[in-house]
Amino acid sequence: VLLLLLVSAVAQESAAPLAVQIRGLIDEYENSVRANTQKIIAATTEEEKNKYRSSIPSAGPYATKMMQLVQANLDQPDVVKAVSWLVTGAANFPEGQEALKMLGTTFADRQGIAEAVKQLEYHGLPAEPVLKAVIEKNTHREEKAAALYALGAIHFKNFDASADRVFGEASKNKALACFQQLNTDYADVTIQGFKLADFAAKMLFEMTNLQVGCEAPEIEGKDADGVSFKLSDYRGKHVIVIFWGGWCHACHGILPLMNQAAAQLKDKNAVVLGVNTDIESEAKKALADYQVAFRNVLDNTTSGPNTSLYNLRNFPTLYLIDPKGLIAIKNGSLDAIVSRILATNNARR
């Protein structure tokens, strides 16, 4: 009887619609991660928390099962959901890498891969052949638009991070070509409710307005006392701008260093200004908790007007604005920025 029940259970599982099997695997994995997270939250000692942190469920076993479903159902429309999950949720496993290759071959012309294709913006240049294949072979608007966006985003990031002028300029031109085609032919396409052209517009703005030598876009708002002020109020001085938030653990360690820099440079024709991205009540708490000694614009969220204008992707982010209001250093280290200010002051003596 037991044997018959087991055979029946296996038969029922294999007979379940493919979409149900895929969703079931994803839910099983996500529920196991969620349950482990709840254990970490509920743990009363650091030792207990570390115990659960070291036992976070791996996506590996689920990736193996998911790839088996893919291989057995290559011609089924719903299988793209499995491929998409492998590419986005199991990218570091062999099955995820295999799915990425399949996305550029077997599934390059399929409908339903747009969300996974968009996520390839985070895979860097190794994803370029896949994205080019989708652009060439796929006739569906969402998929082609997602590939153009992701490829443009990869080239944009290479341009933004490159220290090689020739490589950087080539990357910029490739990004511009992708984004211009996206804006011309697919301006209305949305992925998960967001227009791809809007994301591209932010990167286009950054390429042309947020580079070293550009005039820094105006930063303006109210400080913790409700007093309005602007970046341009400090024209004639070196201005170190830090985008940060109390929610950002990586920001906590640099705040005392920013205070030190503000004190060190106060007689060096330089100031430190912050753009805080917490909601107003949390911002005031963060300013007090970390004893922030420099003036801040309260932007209220990570999508506040100043943070959005500067297209922030990482926190903290530092800029140095020179006395003429031009960007002198972008995404630089505090040490490099302070050294530049001191060197400029010494050169004037």
Predicted segments, located by residue:
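Structural microenvironment flanking redox-active thiols in thiol-disulfide oxidoreductases
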Residues: 252-291, 301-308
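N-terminal leader/linker segments that initiate helical-solenoid repeat arrays
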Residues: 12-60
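Thiol/disulfide oxidoreductase modules built on the thioredoxin-like
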Residues: 288-293, 298-343
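N-proximal helix/coil linker or "cap" segments that precede and/or mark the start of modular domains
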Residues: 122, 167-224, 232-235, 285-288, ...
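Specific register positions within alpha-helical solenoid repeats of the TPR/Sel1-like families, i.e.
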Residues: 34, 84-91, 118-122, 151-163, ...
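Short pre-active-site segment immediately N-terminal to redox-active cysteine/selenocysteine motifs
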Residues: 237-239, 244-247, 279, 314
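Short solvent-exposed coil/turn linkers within tandem alpha-helical repeat scaffolds
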Residues: 69-79, 89-125, 134-145, 161-173, ...
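Conserved redox-active cysteine motifs that mediate thiol-disulfide chemistry
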Residues: 235, 243-260
